[in-house]
C-alpha cells in the first residue's frame, strides 16, 4: 500500500494512544522506527496488515474494529492535509458523493500520486424507501470496515448527517483479469439516514432550461467524429457502431469496422469488471480506462521502415535487435473517460481521451498536444502535471537525500566512535576530551609520579633468528597482555618502542598510591610475560622492569599525530633502573621503595649500591612481592589449585615455572601457561 496509508495509521495511533504505544506497535510488527511511514514508498499488503495486526493484539480488539476506527480517522486526516475543499465540493448530497467515490479514488491514485494502485470500486443505487445501496468491490478482502468508517465520518463532517450502515451481503469470487486471476470481494451496504429532516433530494435543484425536443441537433456525422476524435459507440452486444477519427492512428482500420467486438480491441483496466453491456451499466458512474490490445501503429510503421531499409542494404533482418527493443518499449494506447447510456437504452457512448498525464507519456504514444481537442482538459492536465511531477521528483530526491544523510550521520557516529576510541588509546581521556573540544593542552609539571620501563633482555638474540612476522606476533601477544593489566591497575601506558614498554602512575590523574599501582603492575607483567613463549627456545619469556618515583613534566607533542610525552630526570632514572636490572627482576630506586611503602605493603630485597650510568652510585632494591594482593588478584585470573601456589609469588622465582611446565603436557601451542 501507499506510504500515505502508513503515515495516517501512525498519526491515528500517536494522537490516540501516544508515542510509546506506537513504538510497541513497530517492535511487534518488526519495523524500524522512521522506516514505516515514508510517504512516497510502496509497502506490501503484508507490511500494512502486520501494523494493523500489531495494533489489534496490543489493544485486544479485532482487526475489523481497527480498520473501522482507521476509516473514521482517514477522512479527518485527509481533510486536514489539504483535501478539505475538494471533498466538500464533490456533491451537494450524500448520493452524489457516493457516486463520485470511484472517480475521487482514481484521481488520487493515478493523477496526484501517480501510484497505479489496485484501488476499490464503488457503485451506488437509490432505493424507493430513501435508503441507498452501496456496492463495494475490492481485490483486498477484509478491508470493508474502512468503508463504514469513512462513510459515517464523511456524512457527519460534510453533510451533517448521521447514517447507519448495515452489511446485507458479502461474497468473494475468483476473477480472471488481463494480469491474471485474483480474488475479488463484493460487499453490499445498506446506508440509511438517521436524521431524516434532511433529504438527499433537497439539493438537487430544478432545471433552468425546459426540456424540449423541438430542435434537431445541427451537427453532422463528420463534425461529431472530429469534435470527439477518440469517442466510441457500442451496441448491447458491445460491438463497434461508431468511432472517432483519431483512433485510426493507433488501431488497425480493419479492427475498427462496424460490428467488431469491443473486447477484441480493448481490455478494461479500470474498473476491474468484464467488458460487457450489463457490467458497464452497473458502473456507469465510474471512470473507465481501456487499453488497446493490438501492437501500436507507431511501432508497426517504424518496423516496416526498418524492414525496407534492411532489404535495400542487403542486411539480414533477423540480426536486427532494434525491433525487439522498440517493441518492449512501445506503449499500448490507454483511453480514459466516461461511459454514457444513450437515450435509446440500447447503446453506450464512450467519451474519452488518451490517458496521458505528462510529456514523456505523450511522446511514448507517438502523440503531440495538437492531437487533443482544444476543449479537452487533458491538454491543461498534461502541462500542470508536468510541473507537479517535477515537484514530486524533487520531493523524492529530498527524501532520498535525507535518508542518505541519516545513514551518513549514523556512519559518521560509528567512525567518530572509532576515532574517539583510538584517540583515547593514544592520549589520556581527559587530554583527548580537551583536544576534541579544540582546546590547547598546556604542559603540566607533576611533583611526584612513578615511571616504569620494561623490556625483553633476550630480544636482540631473538630478532636475528626469527622472521619479521614472528617478531610482530611475539610483541603483539606480549603487549596485549600488558595493556589488559594497565586497564586492571588503572595506570597509563605512555608508549612502546621496540620491545620496551613505558607506563606511569599518577599522571595525568593525581593519585596518592601511584607507586603502589606501578609495583602491582610490574609484578603482574613479570607473571604474564611468562605465559608467552620464546620462539627460539620455546620456553617462557622473561622480562625485566625498572621503577623510579619523582617529579615529571607531561604534555602533548605534535599536531598531526599528537603524543602524550613525559620529560624529566625521573624518566631517565627509571630507564636506567630497567637497563641495570637482571633478567626476570623488578629493579626499584630508593625513592620508589619509600613511595610504595607509604601506601602499600611490599617485600623488597636490597641490592646495595649500584653504579648507575649518568647517576653514580645509588641504593637500589628488587621488588619481590605484595603483602596486600596475591599475584592472581593482580592479574585477575583464577588459580589452578592443582599446580599453583596460594599467592602466586613462588611462580615468580626463576626456574619454578620450568619445573611446573615439565609436569604439564602442552599441545602445539605458542602460548605458555603456568596453569
UniProtKB/Swiss-Prot annotation:
Keywords: Behavior, cGMP biosynthesis, Coiled coil, Cytoplasm, GTP-binding, Heme, Iron, Lyase, Magnesium, Metal-binding, Nucleotide-binding. Its EC number is 4.6.1.2. It comes from the Eukaryota. Its cofactor is heme. It is found in: Cytoplasm. Pfam families: Guanylate_cyc, HNOB, HNOBA. It catalyses: GTP = 3',5'-cyclic GMP + diphosphate. One of its GO terms (biological process) is response to oxygen levels. It is an enzyme of class 4 (lyase). Residues 450-578 form the Guanylate cyclase domain. One of its GO terms (cellular component) is guanylate cyclase complex, soluble. InterPro entries: A/G_cyclase, A/G_cyclase_CS, H-NOX_domain_sf, Heme_NO-bd, HNOB_dom_associated, HNOB_dom_associated_sf, NO_sig/Golgi_transp_ligand-bd, Nucleotide_cyclase. Heterodimer; heterodimerizes with gcy-35, and possibly with other soluble guanylate cyclases. Plays a central role in social feeding behavior by synthesizing 3',5'-cyclic guanosine monophosphate (cGMP) from GTP. Oxygen, which probably binds to its heme-binding sites, may regulate social behavior by modulating its activity. cGMP is a common second messenger in sensory transduction and is implicated in oxygen sensation. Indeed, C.elegans exhibits a strong behavioral preference for 5-12% oxygen, avoiding higher and lower oxygen levels; a higher level of oxygen inducing a naturally polymorphic social feeding behavior. Belongs to the adenylyl cyclase class-4/guanylyl cyclase family. This is Soluble guanylate cyclase gcy-36. The gene is gcy-36.
